Amino acid sequence: MAVIRGWDFPEDLYYQVEKHVWVRRLSADVVQVGLTPVGYELLRHSLTAISVRTKNIGQVVSKGKSIAMVESLKYIGPLAAPITGVLLRANERLQDDPDSAPADPYGEGWIAELQPLDWESESAALVTGEAAMTAYETWLSSEKIAWE
């Protein structure tokens, strides 16, 4: 696990850095999606709700389209799908306890599970490993973010 400016970043995950989204490949047919600690910090840890559009369970969600709504005291907006896939499941725990997500963003704080429809080509737009760590450090520097 890499630590960048005080935040943990597992190097085996895939990241959409500019959206602060991580993707964990559970199997060839299932990925988990969640927000990074930086994403939660930008929300100021004041989550009031994370709601996955459960009416869309079983439906195809295109890359860039909303798979969840994130609400904090200062922001309400969509969490965009980092890849195209069938929405399989929402983390129902977050409905009752949205603050558990920032406490364990890579574990109990996952937001949704998708069945990727074109993992091979769409995952190429995500970064992983050392490239992800470099991309996050570059983003934090460019945005002049230095929380720790």
What are these regions (language model features)?
Residues 71-81, 96-100:
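Short, Lys/Arg- and Gly-enriched loop/turn segments at beta-strand edges
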Residues 30, 84-86:
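Structural motif
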Residues 86-115:
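Aromatic- and Lys/Arg-enriched surface recognition patch
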Residues 20-22, 79, 87:
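Conserved hydrophobic positions within beta-strands
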Residues 55-70, 86-89:
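Short, well-structured beta-strand-loop connectors
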Residues 76, 120-123:
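Short beta-strands and strand-coil junctions in structured, solvent-facing domains, enriched
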Residues 1-63, 108-119, 126-133, 137-148:
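Acidic, low-complexity mobile loops and tails
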